């Protein structure tokens, strides 16, 4: 099957959206799609300007924002996205968005 880079990226994005797949490594995803890790990493860099890890983290945090906006608790979000702890999730969220998840929720509802 000859797919364009864009089609492959869409399939990978859909795959990573499935519950339980948010924390897969580049090695695991490349294996799932029958390509080398090096090829996957190059594809992500070319298509997004980010590393696979940066992109996957961004996808997780955008999901987190949506879930927090829908009323899911910080603990539930951290667990759903396979963070090792609430504090690990909070720290990463703050690194990306410059606010904690709790501050984000307060701002969203003010």
Residue ranges and their predicted role:
Residues 36-37, 84-85:
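Short coil turns linking two alpha-helices in DNA-binding domains
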Residues 23, 27, 46-84, 90, ...:
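Terminal helix-turn-helix DNA-binding modules in bacterial transcription factors
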Residues 1-33, 46-54, 58:
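Short, Lys/Arg-enriched, Trp-marked, Pro/Gly-tolerant hinge/linker segments that flank
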């Amino acid at each position: 099957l000859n797919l364009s880079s864009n089609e492959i990226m869409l399939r990978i994005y859909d795959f990573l959206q499935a519950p339980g797949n948010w924390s897969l490594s580049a090695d695991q995803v490349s294996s799932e799609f029958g390509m080398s890790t090096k090829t996957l990493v190059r594809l992500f860099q070319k298509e997004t300007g980010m590393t696979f890890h940066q992109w996957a983290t961004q996808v997780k945090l955008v999901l987190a924002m949506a879930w927090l906006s829908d009323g899911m608790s910080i603990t539930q979000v951290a667990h759903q996205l396979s963070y090792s702890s609430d504090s690990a999730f909070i720290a990463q969220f703050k690194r990306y968005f410059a606010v904690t998840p709790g501050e984000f929720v307060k701002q969203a509802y003010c």
